[in-house]
Amino acid sequence: MTINATVKEAGFRPASRISSIGVSEILKIGARAAAMKREGKPVIILGAGEPDFDTPDHVKQAASDAIHRGETKYTALDGTPELKKAIREKFQRENGLAYELDEITVATGAKQILFNAMMASLDPGDEVVIPTPYWTSYSDIVQICEGKPILIACDASSGFRLTAQKLEAAITPRTRWVLLNSPSNPSGAAYSAADYRPLLDVLLKHPHVWLLVDDMYEHIVYDAFRFVTPARLEPGLKDRTLTVNGVSKAYAMTGWRIGYAGGPRALIKAMAVVQSQATSCPSSVSQAASVAALNGPQDFLKERTESFQRRRNLVVNGLNAIEGLDCRVPEGAFYTFSGCAGVARRVTPSGKRIESDTDFCAYLLEDSHVAVVPGSAFGLSPYFRISYATSEAELKEALERISAACKRLS
């Protein structure tokens, strides 16, 4: 259902730039699951896109100290010098990328970074190449900014990764950006240096195309996978690459709302113009906390990633043991993206035929009280996403319920 359909009854006519944007399937499922919980039903919600760990104590203490120092006023528009220096050092230390402070921007979450970049660069009809499955906001942000999302299906047969052949075929004179996310939400797929190389070679041939990389799940990778970011791999693309990151996932700071990016000075300046007329500066207290996160101890990241890996293994093994489901092993993030084509056309105990991944997920919620998200919400069917950012006990119970639900299909 689109925005137009939901608000016209109230006599309000939405702007055309948002009229085609639908209400998030994730939000609808979450609302239904929450309502069922309020009714006393034992719902297990596996849709959360945030870590279940707490923000580290030293980060919380830094925020408290900032408050007591009176650092509760406006800051510089796109980030304090202290935070920009911490980000610069992080990029150099962990990614081998060198940026000046005026090539770094800070915003109220990585989502605002993406919005600022698209708003600052897209003219009506400009195209943005987005591999599917994709994080749901990518396409909507492009549309709000009057760009045209070019969605390229990348299913399990390609490891949910874009290929050079598909990228080359998608590029036109109107292409402005290619958007890549590694590790990916929702698939958990990640690009190695070898995976990136053919894509970067394609981009080198098309100097009018810029690259936006979302590295938010950088620190959550498994099985000795070596994370790498494209601007390091190909210096020839650095002057048209925006490298996006944030503190939300690695440091369990989703509610602190700090995202950041490094990129060409002219783009960063244009993004600041957009931000100046939107939110102005990010939260001063959150910025102080983020300095502590980036500059402070990082050893806890390994322990948390090991915990996520145990859960990943539990979920992947459990799903692959269920007839009709097929789950690829993700390289990172905290999601599985399982195929469910094997249950298509089967019939539920109530007599409803499963025609889509949306039907399957609705069945799991209503029949077994397990909330997962259909692949259609991420632009690729028939799949469903599970977030394993919850306890192993809850994951085991959810897998038992999903298995039992599949056995009841005829």
Swiss-Prot record:
Its EC number(s): 2.6.1.1
Catalytic activity: L-aspartate + 2-oxoglutarate = oxaloacetate + L-glutamate
This protein's name: Aspartate aminotransferase
Compartments, record wording: Cytoplasm
Keywords assigned by UniProt, alphabetized: Aminotransferase, Cytoplasm, Pyridoxal phosphate, Transferase
Name of the gene encoding the protein in the UniProt record: aatB
A GO CC annotation given for this chain: cytoplasm
Oligomeric form and interacting partners: Homodimer.
